[in-house]
Amino acid sequence: MTQFEKLDLLLRECGGTIQTFQVLNNGISKSVFYAYVKERGLEQASHGVYVSPDTWTDAMYLLHLRCGQAVFSHETALFFHDLTDREPLKYTITVRTGYNPSRLQEDGFQVYTVKKDLHEIGITTMLTSFGHSVPAYDMERTICDLLRSRKNIEMQVFQDALKQYAKRKDKNLRVLMKYAAMFHVEKILRPYLEVLL
């Protein structure tokens, strides 16, 4: 099997998206890989990420590959959890404080930052419409994030999401209140819950 055939197989196994580190881990040099990229007409989606020209582009998955610490949050997480019927105009992510989000913002993403110890709270895995796994915050964390960012969020979006959450059988009010205390939004959240529950 030639190295190009190995790369063809790897590209198929990875669903048409391949990263340079995967190539190197399979014992193929960068120079061979770059010749393959040119020969097969692969497009560079971001640094170290290449996509086959006949593959549908999964923007969410590419964003995840581009910025591994990014977690889909706010309106995008609402959409993942069916807590809104509005498809987000731009994807919203949260990264740790200290990460420079300027390039992501220039590319049209809404980026929030949070302290490192709060970044990992409530992370779950969701599937994009293309079937790729990406990190997103759970419903309870998303509601707390919306309250923390309420100056940047339409109040109607938050209220509709909370109404949808209250109807859900898989809601976890204990976790919601725990997160609300951690994120200092308990006093704001409680009156809404008293009306809905």
Q: What positions do the PLM features span?
A:
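Nucleic-acid-binding surface
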Residues: 6, 17-22, 49-197
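Charged, low-complexity surface patches
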Residues: 12, 25-26, 66
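Short amphipathic alpha-helical interaction segments
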Residues: 26-38
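Conserved short "hinge" loops at termini or chain/domain junctions
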Residues: 1, 19-21, 26
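Short amphipathic alpha-helical interface segments
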Residues: 1-16
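A short, conserved structural fragment
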Residues: 40-46
